[in-house]
């Protein structure tokens, strides 16, 4: 559309702005075509720019390639540095796939230390495909090879959370963690639709005026109409759209309704609810196992953060509290044998819990050839046994 399109959009905002009305403009981009002119425009008009980058070069270039099959990392970083040069506000969006999900700390620390961002989003890649590996609408139970695996995604989030909660609370903000904190505090909205009880507020407007229920459901069955024919406010209020949002709650399987972390998850995004429970009920989220592990893992620190904030104290005070707890546990572990019960109270032997472990750092992968075949993975029912 070009820069002139956005200049015209700003002109129309100014023309029709009513007293007391404010506009917030955001734009998501991979940054590869940014130049000084674009960045000057963004700065002048207070745009918030989301940059799509999937971690260090080896991880980013695994899937983010240009038409020639070449990695785009250098061009993305060039665009990012231009935003920084012009003082444009930006944040980072990372798609979590089956490759970079195995390197959570490398991704997080790269964004924090090399990119220099203090706000991150981690979006799981879950793509449904047919027998030929072609992308489908909301059908079937097979996913593409690059789709992150459920427990793999849970480990990704958990590992980053442990780094963040001990070192970066108050200085780095991770969207999933912020939403979780809101739900632990019992707020009416987490600020993130996938973790709210109902949804329907994140509609998608196409260039031709067609309005869809959600940007994950830009499909014929979810076309609400065209804003050239009907006012947008009327389309948003239609029974079709209200039902779409309410279905997020009404279609939860019994396993979700009985789940101890339902308040934090709410079944996540409806687009990912295509597996079945152990009892055969449809509508279980493909990522259920990972989210369950993540939300149960963060329960203790989230309760501390909640109590701090409700007392009017900064959430960052959780860091020294957890550091003291860790030191006390380490001292207790040192006093027991490997085969004794772990002092943490898990009921496991120390060697299987908080005992010393050998760690081996895995090297970052080389970029996959773009012509490499992409085998499929079939989703099976997720058992209630956690």
Q: What residue spans do the PLM features occupy?
A:
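Local cysteine-cluster metal-coordination motifs and their immediate loop/turn environment
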Residues: 213-216, 253-271, 290, 341-355
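Canonical radical SAM enzyme core domain
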Residues: 1-59, 66-78, 82, 94-106, ...
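Radical SAM enzyme [4Fe-4S]-AdoMet core and its adjacent flexible, acidic
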Residues: 62-74, 81, 85-194, 198, ...
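Basic, glycine-rich polyanion-binding accessory segments appended to enzymes
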Residues: 243-281, 300
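Short cysteine/histidine-rich metal-coordination sites, predominantly Zn2+-binding motifs
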Residues: 272-288, 303-310, 357-372
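Acidic/negatively charged segments and metal-coordination signatures
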Residues: 313-386
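Membrane-interface junctions of multi-pass transporters
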Residues: 218-261
């Amino acid at each position: 559309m070009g820069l002139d399109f956005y200049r015209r959009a700003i002109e129309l905002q100014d023309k029709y702005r009513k007293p007391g009305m404010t506009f917030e403009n955001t734009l998501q981009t991979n940054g590869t075509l940014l130049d000084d002119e674009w960045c000057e425009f963004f700065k002048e008009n207070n745009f918030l720019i989301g940059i799509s980058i999937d971690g260090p070069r080896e991880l980013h270039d695994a899937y983010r390639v240009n038409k020639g099959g070449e990695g785009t990392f250098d061009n993305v970083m060039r665009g990012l540095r231009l935003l920084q040069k012009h003082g444009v506000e930006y944040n980072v969006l990372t798609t979590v796939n089956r490759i970079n999900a195995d390197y959570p700390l490398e991704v997080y620390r790269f964004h924090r230390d090399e990119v220099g961002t203090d706000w991150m989003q981690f979006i799981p890649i879950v793509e449904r495909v047919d027998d030929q590996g072609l992308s489908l609408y909301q059908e079937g139970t097979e996913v593409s090879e690059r789709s992150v695996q459920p427990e793999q995604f849970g480990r990704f989030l958990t590992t980053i959370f442990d780094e963040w909660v001990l070192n970066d609370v108050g200085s780095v903000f991770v969207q999933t963690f912020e939403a979780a904190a809101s739900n632990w505090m019992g707020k009416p909205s987490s600020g993130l639709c996938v973790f709210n009880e109902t949804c329907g507020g994140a509609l998608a407007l196409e260039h031709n005026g067609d309005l869809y229920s959600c940007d994950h459901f830009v499909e014929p069955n979810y076309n609400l109409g065209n804003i050239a024919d009907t006012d947008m406010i009327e389309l948003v209020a239609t029974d079709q759209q209200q039902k779409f949002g309410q279905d997020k709650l009404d279609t939860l399987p019994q396993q979700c309704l009985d789940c101890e972390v339902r308040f934090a998850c709410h079944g996540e995004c409806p687009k990912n609810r295509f597996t079945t429970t152990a009892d055969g009920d449809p509508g279980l989220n493909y990522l259920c196992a990972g989210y369950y592990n993540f939300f149960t893992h963060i329960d203790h620190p989230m309760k501390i953060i909640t109590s701090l904030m409700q007392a009017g104290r900064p959430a960052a005070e959780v860091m020294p509290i957890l550091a003291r707890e860790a030191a006390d546990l380490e001292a207790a572990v040192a006093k027991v044998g490997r085969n004794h019960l772990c002092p943490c109270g898990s009921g496991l032997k120390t060697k299987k819990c908080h005992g010393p472990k050998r760690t081996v750092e895995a090297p970052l992968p080389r970029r996959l050839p773009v012509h490499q075949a992409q085998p499929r993975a079939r989703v099976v029912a997720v058992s209630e046994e956690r």
